[in-house]
């Protein structure tokens, strides 16, 4: 096994259990590790610090363990069992009203580079590192062992997330299928609401599970209101609003595929179609042209405006423009649920962008709640970068 020797003084982050080793911290590589190999990390004093997946790039090692010798044949089953135990402890894995959740959330479950979502018997995984991609068969086998007969399939959807320069064969496909299972989509239930999830053609793993608790919060406020759901994707917030008794819901997204799924979700929910309109248009263009006071509840949940620090300033300006448009148009006494899923945008920076937006409109705005990601998207306390989803619930006079 290859060894990574750190520069003097660069071991402190590992001693604080941060799960990344940056390339600039490395003094020497002993051996010739391939991308995705498990390597051991040592300080200048020769003491073992961690073991993890090696990769060429800014993050050179993603730590799998701070103990020596534990990455063995039982490792994957042990780690996935621990992740499942947390979902059982929080009541999510055996919920009577929800049968979809995130099983593995990367660093939050001490498995950096790996995401696994559970959709009522189907596990959809995405590898964000060469090491996790190369371990996908072992991961699938471990899922079979921990779920048993409950598991219908394991689908690998890493072609858009794994590093394409690492020489990997990035083709999506099934790693396991139970006899007789031939579906690429199915209906799942979240807090009693039905949704169609297509893991082969949908974005990410097929559904944005990280907004589950925030969708439930929208449900509390939507009764009797005219609702606008911007960047709606498959209409998660829209379905909750309809279920709450919203007077009317308009769902807006630029993706025709997404809008088709919104309509299907409205249909399987048995909602009165006259209470919902799907609009396949640019969200910001629509918001600029919409009459003032038409909506008294808005959801503003755009895709990540910044995926790296170089795009941060442009992203903050985009959040300011978007939120200024929403705050200026919402009816007096209305609510705005606004979000950022950009990891590089901090809670403080996002709040400042929204403050600037509110000041630009001149309206009186209260923050009623600060919104986050749910328990199955846990944040490793030693890896604060994992807290990527942030939101504000605004009341606008």
Residue spans for each PLM region:
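C-terminal catalytic and target-recognition region of SAM-dependent MTase-like enzymes
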Residues: 294, 335-397
């Amino acid at each position: 096994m290859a060894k990574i020797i750190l520069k003097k003084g660069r071991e402190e982050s590992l001693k604080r259990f941060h799960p990344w080793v940056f390339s600039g911290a490395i003094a020497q590589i002993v051996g010739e590790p391939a991308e995705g190999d498990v390597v051991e990390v040592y300080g200048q004093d020769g003491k073992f610090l961690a073991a993890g997946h090696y990769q060429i790039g800014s993050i050179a090692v993603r730590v799998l363990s701070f103990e020596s010798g534990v990455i063995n044949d039982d490792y994957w089953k042990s780690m996935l069992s621990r992740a499942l135990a947390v979902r059982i402890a929080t009541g999510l894995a055996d919920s009577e009203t929800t049968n979809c959740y995130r099983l593995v959330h990367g660093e939050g479950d001490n498995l950096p580079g790996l995401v696994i979502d559970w959709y009522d018997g189907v596990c959809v995984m995405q590898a964000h590192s060469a090491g996790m991609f190369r371990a996908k068969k072992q991961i699938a086998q471990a899922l079979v062992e921990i779920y048993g007969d409950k598991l219908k399939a394991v689908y690998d959807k890493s072609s858009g997330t794994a590093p394409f320069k690492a020489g990997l064969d990035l083709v999506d496909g099934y790693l396991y299928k139970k006899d007789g299972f031939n579906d690429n989509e199915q209906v799942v239930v979240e807090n009693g609401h039905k949704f169609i999830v297509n893991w082969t053609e949908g974005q990410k793993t097929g559904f944005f599970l990280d907004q589950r608790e925030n969708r439930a919060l929208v449900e509390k406020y939507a009764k009797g209101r005219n609702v606008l759901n911007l960047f709606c994707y498959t209409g998660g917030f829209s379905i909750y609003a309809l279920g709450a008794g919203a007077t009317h819901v308009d769902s807006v997204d630029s993706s025709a595929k997404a809008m088709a799924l919104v309509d299907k979700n409205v249909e399987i929910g048995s909602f009165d179609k006259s209470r919902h309109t799907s609009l396949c248009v640019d969200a910001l263009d629509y918001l600029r042209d919409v009459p003032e006071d038409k909506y008294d509840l808005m959801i503003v949940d755009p895709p990540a405006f910044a995926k790296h620090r170089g795009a941060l300033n442009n992203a903050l300006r985009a959040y300011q423009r978007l939120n200024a448009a929403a705050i200026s148009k919402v009816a007096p006494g209305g609510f705005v649920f606004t979000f950022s899923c950009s990891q590089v945008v901090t809670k403080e920076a996002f709040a400042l962008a929204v403050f600037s937006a509110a000041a630009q409109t001149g309206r009186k705005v209260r923050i009623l709640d600060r919104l986050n990601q749910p328990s199955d998207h846990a944040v490793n306390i030693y890896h604060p970068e994992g807290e990527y989803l942030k939101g504000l619930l605004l009341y606008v006079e």
